[in-house]
Amino acid sequence: MDATQITLVRESGHICAASIYTSWTQSGQLTQNGLSVLYYLLCKNSCGKYVPKFAEITVQQEDLCRYSRHGGSVSAATFASICRAASSAALDAWPLEPLGNADTWRCLHGTALATLRRVLGFKSFYSPVTFETDTNTGLLLKTIPDEHALNNDNTPSTGVLRANFPVAIDVSAVSACNAHTQGTSLAYARLTALKSNGDTQQQTPLDVEVITPKAYIRRKYKSTFSPPIEREGQTSDLFNLEERRLVLSGNRAIVVRVLLPCYFDCLTTDSTVTSSLSILATYRLWYAAAFGKPGVVRPIFAYLGPELNPKGEDRDYFCTVGFPGWTTLRTQTPAVESIRTATEMYMETDGLWPVTGIQAFHYLAPWGQHPPLPPRVQDLIGQIPQDTGHADATVNWDAGRISTVFKQPVQLQDRWMAKFDFSAFFPTIYCAMFPMHFRLGKIVLARMRRGMGCLKPALVSFFGGLRHILPSIYKAIIFIANEISLCVEQTALEQGFAICTYIKDGFWGIFTDLHTRNVCSDQARCSALNLAAACERAVTGLLRIQLGLNFTPAMEPVLRVEGVYTHAFTWCTTGSWLWNLQTNTPPDLVGVPWRSQAARDLKERLSGLLCTATKIRERIQENCIWDRVLYDIWAGQVVEAARKTYVDFFEHVFDRRYTPVYWSLQEQNSETKAIPASYLTYGHMQDKDYKPRQIIMVRNPNPHGPPTVVYWELLPSCACIPPIDCAAHLKPLIHTFVTIINHLLDAHNDFSSPSLKFTDDPLASYNFLFL
């Protein structure tokens, strides 16, 4: 700042949201390589009144793309240029400047917010602070965390936005984009066509409804920029226009204007009712109304959402860089719980998840440049080539340990078994190495206690993203995870527990001395808890003593007991069934397809069949030695039970043969291809095509031809869909069913003679049901 005198005014409150108002580059020794950014902060003072505050920061060039795959390829001048384009377009233009370079905008959004947090000093949105504002410049200089504030549990004040804007977009333009990029989401294709050609229908109606704790407005427009034909409520009850004169660096004076909410700082929208285009149409209208009058610097108005990814994304979100300055949250339903989930995600990540994806937690870190690995960890990793044992583990388990002691299908009984799982395992290791990352640590700690379930995908994304962003950190975490697995295995052996299968962050095995006939389920669980505690102590010792890591006791690894079991059956490393016959609790069955509801129903029946097979053996073998005669009797009854199971399943699915949602599968990335032109006439359905597509297979008119894939969710409910090819959906499921039954028959065969085989071809016998 060039101001020679600073006059501070202090005010208590908290930050609700922060958005880039404008940005620029300027010459000078301190900023010649950086990007200057003016932030608008929507704040709430201690009296409960919303107040606008503004802060100027400089994002250094080396910080701009630090955690991006772009590396240092995007200059500060480029960032300033795209921001200028997003604030100087026509007032009726769509805020689609990020289309085609969304990653660059996400990088700008994340790095600028990270810099703002470090410069001002606040911990997070909604945490109580004391604002220090220079009255000479109008700029916020500092925020001092207030640890002793009376109100330390601030939460968002939410309103509800509903909008309907059935915009028509040139079908030929959408088709061209869809054909040009194989597998492009139709939402992306529509936005591309909209940005290039605009609306094909000038009189698109817009219906808007906003509900806040103390206000309600509704407007209905015949076309977007015409006067409303229906109105209810006053916009002044919703927000007001506020102007401020600011003096920026270089003594440059500007006037800014914002929409300041009266009773909300977040608007929630139900994604099943309101499309992103409808929200953008509403905000575009408000933007034009707010800045149609000249005399102020216009803010950036740029949209970031899953529709901007050509392949779509797994999660729904809505983010605008710049205008309107408050937060817009997408919810799966209008229910209170869904809104609570959305606001929790926003509060814990300052709105950076899921919009910035794998980079989100890097932008929440207290540092700019990531700190190096702890010295002892670095030294041990450097010794790997000379240490054969460690080298083998690292080479063979380069994504985490996956191992089993079994070479063929096996069934286990007579001894108690248990399954264990480390809570938030890989993020916990990261936090043990870098305990200064308090924001991540808070979420990891909550996940250890089964809290913040909505952020579990964020943690998974964070760890997976390390492989691309910080590969050395990723390799170090895998190295430590593998060392932990060896430590756990040794500790378990000392406790009389043999690990059978170990998969990354969990394992199951058998207590060698706990007989199921002599020990009850509660006693077995007590033994499992004692084993978990012993493993936790051993792992904590490994991390603290051998690796030299210094972290708080609250962040010590937690090994959770998933269950104790009397019987087990495993047919491959990732396929197993565990059951507690004494308590008759639902079995733990993994390694079976579950992509559709039909698959999940068969999985449930298969799990029940395995329980039945166990009970049959218990009944037949009671007080007898298991021999070939008993095996043959058992196997015959199991085969008969398997027949009854698939017949019951076929009867069940027969009643659902015309129900698309029952058969629906998520399309795999490798299957994605251009959508046929016949889907391009349903614009309102295309706007929802930004997630992995759901498909069903329908019968080919040619009886000898392959089934046809139908993207049924992109069709209106009144569409006539050809008969579902149930047999095509069932074929892989029944194949798995038959294969596992044969593995079961092999697992129980302790004799040299061949096992009985389940030779049925269920589909061949019952295919007539689905013709």
From Swiss-Prot:
It comes from Varicella-zoster virus (strain Oka vaccine). This is DNA helicase/primase complex-associated protein. The keyword Transmembrane helix does not apply. One of its GO terms (biological process) is viral genome replication. Keywords: DNA replication, Host nucleus. Disulfide bonds: none annotated. It comes from the Viruses. Component of the helicase/primase complex. Unwinds the DNA at the replication forks and generates single-stranded DNA for both leading and lagging strand synthesis. The primase synthesizes short RNA primers on the lagging strand that the polymerase presumably elongates using dNTPs. The primase-associated factor has no known catalytic activity in the complex and may serve to facilitate the formation of the replisome by directly interacting with the origin-binding protein and the polymerase. Belongs to the herpesviridae HEPA family. It is found in: Host nucleus.
